[in-house]
Amino acid sequence: MATYLEFIQQNEERDGVRFSWNVWPSSRLEATRMVVPLACLLTPLRERPDLPPVQYEPVLCSRPTCKAVLNPLCQVDYRAKLWACNFCFQRNQFPPAYAGISEVNQPAELMPQFSTIEYIVQRGPQTPLIFLYVVDTCLEEEDLQALKESLQMSLSLLPADALVGLITFGRMIQVHELSCEGISKSYVFRGTKDLTAKQIQDMLGLSRPAVPIQQGRPLQAPEQPVISSRFLQPVHKIDMNLTDLLGELQRDPWPVTQGKRPLRSTGVALSIAVGLLEGTFPNTGARIMLFTGGPPTQGPGMVVGDELKTPIRSWHDIEKDNARFMKKATKHYETLANRTATNGHCIDIYACALDQTGLLEMKCCANLTGGHMVMGDSFNTSLFKQTFQRVFNKGLNGEFRMAFGANLEVKTSRELKIAGAIGPCVSLNVKGPCVSENELGIGGTSQWKICGLDPCTTLAIYFEVVNQHNAPIPQGGRGAVQFVTQYQHSSTQKRIRVTTIARNWADAQSQLQHIEAAFDQEAAAVLMARLGVYRAESEEGPDVLRWLDRQLIRLCQKFGQYNKDDPNSFRLSESFSLYPQFMFHLRRSPFLQVFNNSPDESSYYRHHFARQDLTQSLIMIQPILYAYSFHGPPEPVLLDSSSILPDRILLMDTFFQIVIYLGETIAQWQKAGYQDMPEYENFKHLLQAPLDDAQEILQTRFPMPRYVHTEHGGSQARFLLSKVNPSQTHNNLYAWGQESGAPILTDDVSLQVFMDHLKKLAVSSAA
């Protein structure tokens, strides 16, 4: 019998699913007493090189309110060619193509190893992928030049038949016609006035052909090219012309006087991009890629005025309700994001500037559409250049790692209902019998739209057990969930990926130890963290921390072993033991602590946390620390100030930064140049080892992390010191005659103090 850890691992590898509980409490009452909700992390397009897609349509349950897909959990009568749906128990005929099936000749979707299966379905004409570049020209010369080179480079990475378009903006917005005649023409719009989709389409001459397409199918083929030909062209036709056009782009010509910001019409430029795609290619895979080097300063969506003496809003301003443009700008971008999501398009934001660029207001454009958000200091850095290049990376099978216009539907057996989802998605408002009235995250629906996704995109999906306490589930009963993801593959094929999973029910009163042993503390920590970060968007920070603390105390009261009022007797079993420290680091993380971060930085961190898979999310919550020394091979060490020793090099991975920190002695040796002397070859290798390991992480991570190389006493050592558990501070340094580790100058509580308080509260009879 495999251990639960192995079971969890195998399921994640096969199905891309991690549940908080892997044996489910069998009644609503017992489930609420578990504190951590029944929920899962789902990576719909997890890479499975061993899973070739099948070239036929899935077989669906015939009950109109169910339509679940045939799967290995269904009961099959091979003689009568019937199958019973495991969700609604409807008996269904197999289609004629399945006439030859038998116990020894099963179709793939009935085999247990195909609990996840992918179908290629041909529905409607194939349309090429679309990339629309929206480029800010109010940049410094050096930055603009670097951005132009990156954009020119990207043309060679696009699929040859992809359509590409270009909009540039500064004080005015220019929509460029991309013809092959070599004459550059563009339509110019004022940046101060918002336009409706209809106005944009009329001005660009897009409305005429749109009517026949709606009514008569035969006209579609000849009319479609007319629409796109002027603004969106196949890259293989116009790559030379577009390369020249990008090369000739100039800085915004409007003079910027001393003490002023350039007038930047980002809000209207995005609005025109959304309107252009809405009128030409609704419900087709398309990316709007916004490159901006500063905040929007005029027109709808502006986040700050053009006077440099008035700084852009800070958290302090927002708390004091002193951010005068914020609400209006956020509303403008939310409207655009919802329109974009309705059309199945996604918006990427690449913001590179030393000051804030308005990501707080614009975040919904990427968050609701599944677009990327990249934040850097300048377009002329390897951080931006390599991250942008990775957008076009190819997977193990030589295909782009991007998919478009996905529709995720969740089906459950009758004892469960769906409470909601958290991730880069929007609700499709599909009500049904399996939708709960209690919402967690984006609820009230059993279907969500994810306009842009890749093999790492991960959603958190929350469930509610609705089975009544007095209606027991028969012994050995299993609950089931099916995830059906329909999407446009980067090869423009329509595909459907179906994952069907089942877990055992258990009576929490007589079989609590089974439920407890099957707790996945890593998944639970990430699922609770997502709920906390989701709440932090609309609630006060201290309230969210209090809520997380309360949940942690309740969990410890429920599953800890202790004598009343005796904190020293408190123990947590192995399947819960790491959970409190995840919560400790989450409380200190930039997702919940806005101190020392700008609103843009907080939005950026939260954006990535809401879409990464379990492994990356855990690194964000509790960074990984490796130590390199002469005492042995590199080893993971505690994220604690006691790990900072003079004769060690530390490598810390926080997901957003890779920090290499040289201990005091190592730094002195390096300054003395020992690594250059032949007799200290081993010291040279020691210095090189963390650099090689860091390089490996830098090669694969998206977005590329910031790389920090520092030493004891260096100004950038703060990146490490702010993350480690401050077990030794300036207050307790001399207690117990401690010698090891570095004291941290902080008033933050340490993990030890946190755990002591937690134990005290958990065992208290007053609680």
UniProtKB/Swiss-Prot annotation:
COPII is composed of at least five proteins: the Sec23/24 complex, the Sec13/31 complex and Sar1. It comes from Gallus gallus. GO terms for cellular component: COPII vesicle coat; cytosol; endoplasmic reticulum exit site; endoplasmic reticulum membrane; perinuclear region of cytoplasm. The keyword Zinc applies. The lineage of its organism: Eukaryota, Metazoa, Chordata, Craniata, Vertebrata. This is Protein transport protein Sec23A. The keyword Cytoplasm applies. Gelsolin-like repeats lie at residues 634-720. Component of the coat protein complex II (COPII) which promotes the formation of transport vesicles from the endoplasmic reticulum (ER). The coat has two main functions, the physical deformation of the endoplasmic reticulum membrane into vesicles and the selection of cargo molecules for their transport to the Golgi complex.
